[in-house]
């Protein structure tokens, strides 16, 4: 199963990330969403770690909005501690940064996608990258540390198949049901969309 954890000190984070969260839930289903928008105590971090029992993979969304005179350009230190503790769980974790890309440490990060924004177009693009619906071709416009320098990026082609092989979809029963329903005038017609 999948967990989606949103970490931010911004009061509007859940609303800003609504499109991304909705796409995750709609695409995967049965997603455990955890929203954290305050600093975490040790007990709070342990509670989240406990909630990860039975979780096979996690998507973590970070939202740090850099605003004038706020003095914050990275995630809260207790959120960084949570990331360190989650790495020890040995489950695949992908982190999406919406807003500021800076972290106190990148040692706990397995997969990191920086979007620099939290608008609707960015949310859709992030969801498309997560599910392999579009190519990944971005590169860093800034230096994050001595390892991840400006221009660094990983190129990845979109998925056009399922689980390593071309999709061979055959719906003879579905067509039969539709034809029968139309013939019996249950409904006047049908449209079929396969994504």
Residue ranges of predicted features:
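A short, well-structured edge-of-sheet supersecondary motif
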Residues: 179-195
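C-terminal non-catalytic regions of proteins with extracellular/luminal or membrane-system context
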Residues: 1-166
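Short amphipathic alpha-helical segments
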Residues: 171-179
């Amino acid at each position: 199963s999948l967990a989606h954890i949103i970490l931010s000190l911004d009061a509007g984070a859940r609303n800003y990330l609504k499109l991304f969260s909705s796409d995750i839930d709609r695409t995967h289903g049965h997603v455990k969403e955890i929203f954290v928008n305050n600093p975490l105590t040790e007990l709070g971090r342990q509670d989240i770690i406990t909630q990860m029992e039975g979780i096979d993979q996690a998507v973590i969304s970070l939202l740090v909005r850099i605003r004038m005179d706020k003095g914050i350009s990275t995630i809260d230190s207790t959120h960084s501690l949570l990331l360190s503790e989650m790495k020890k769980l040995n489950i695949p974790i992908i982190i999406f940064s919406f807003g500021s890309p800076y972290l106190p440490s990148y040692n706990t990060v397995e997969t990191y996608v920086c979007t620099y924004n939290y608008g609707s177009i960015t949310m859709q693009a992030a969801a498309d990258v997560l599910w392999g619906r579009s190519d990944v071709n971005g590169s860093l416009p800034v230096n994050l540390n001595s390892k991840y320098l400006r221009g660094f990026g990983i190129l990845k082609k979109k998925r056009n198949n399922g689980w390593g092989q071309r999709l061979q979809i055959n719906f003879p029963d579905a067509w039969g049901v539709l034809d029968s329903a139309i013939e019996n005038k249950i409904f006047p017609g049908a449209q079929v969309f396969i994504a």
